[in-house]
Amino acid sequence: MTRNILLTVTLICIVFITVGGQSPATAPIHSPSTSPHKPKPTSPAISPAAPTPESTEAPAKTPVEAPVEAPPSPTPASTPQISPPAPSPEADTPSAPEIAPSADVPAPALTKHKKKTKKHKTAPAPGPASELLSPPAPPGEAPGPGPSDAFSPAADDQSGAQRISVVIQMVGAAAIAWSLLVLAF
């Protein structure tokens, strides 16, 4: 039973060693860039000959033919000059349509039978408290520049103290793991 416990604790220590092996401060920030791919040539080229088995005679090289030049294209014929477009005829601008006079609509006549409606007493909605309408008060003592601003989170720590502490922790965990393995067996 004790061997199982010691083995479990040892495995846990080994896991801590491997997980803590690289601290986030030393981890790479950018992923490695891939090498650029060579673009495939788009011009028609003579494909290389298939590899031939080794022979004692040197293969004869065929002369490479130069590409045939295309015949010069004929000069385009001069285009006829186009006359400017004819001015558009001036059209009479239509006048605005006349507005029809509105007819007076008589009010509906009152009837003897009146519908009974329920009257509700409407209470005004409560408004927000006056304290909520004003902006918050500034703190009594605003923090001024002090020693806490000396180390900003953007500045990298170049002292190496963190690396040393991580290495010490890894060595300690490895020593504990090995001692537990020795005690277990």
From Swiss-Prot:
<dbReference type="GO" id="GO:0005886">
    <property type="term" value="C:plasma membrane"/>
</dbReference>
<feature type="compositionally biased region" description="Pro residues">
    <location>
        <begin position="135"/>
        <end position="146"/>
    </location>
</feature>
<comment type="function">
    <text>Proteoglycan that seems to be implicated in diverse developmental roles such as differentiation, cell-cell recognition, embryogenesis and programmed cell death.</text>
</comment>
<dbReference type="InterPro" id="IPR044981">
    <property type="entry name" value="AGP9/17/18"/>
</dbReference>
<feature type="propeptide" description="Removed in mature form">
    <location>
        <begin position="160"/>
        <end position="185"/>
    </location>
</feature>
<protein>
    <recommendedName>
        <fullName>Lysine-rich arabinogalactan protein 17</fullName>
    </recommendedName>
</protein>
<dbReference type="GO" id="GO:0098552">
    <property type="term" value="C:side of membrane"/>
</dbReference>
<keyword id="KW-1003">Cell membrane</keyword>
<keyword id="KW-0732">Signal</keyword>
<feature type="compositionally biased region" description="Pro residues">
    <location>
        <begin position="69"/>
        <end position="88"/>
    </location>
</feature>
<keyword id="KW-0654">Proteoglycan</keyword>
<feature type="region of interest" description="Disordered">
    <location>
        <begin position="25"/>
        <end position="160"/>
    </location>
</feature>
<keyword id="KW-0336">GPI-anchor</keyword>
<keyword id="KW-0325">Glycoprotein</keyword>
<feature type="signal peptide">
    <location>
        <begin position="1"/>
        <end position="21"/>
    </location>
</feature>
<feature type="lipid moiety-binding region" description="GPI-anchor amidated serine">
    <location>
        <position position="159"/>
    </location>
</feature>
<feature type="compositionally biased region" description="Basic residues">
    <location>
        <begin position="111"/>
        <end position="122"/>
    </location>
</feature>
<comment type="similarity">
    <text>Belongs to the lysine-rich AGP family.</text>
</comment>
<feature type="compositionally biased region" description="Low complexity">
    <location>
        <begin position="43"/>
        <end position="68"/>
    </location>
</feature>
<keyword id="KW-0472">Membrane</keyword>
<keyword id="KW-0449">Lipoprotein</keyword>
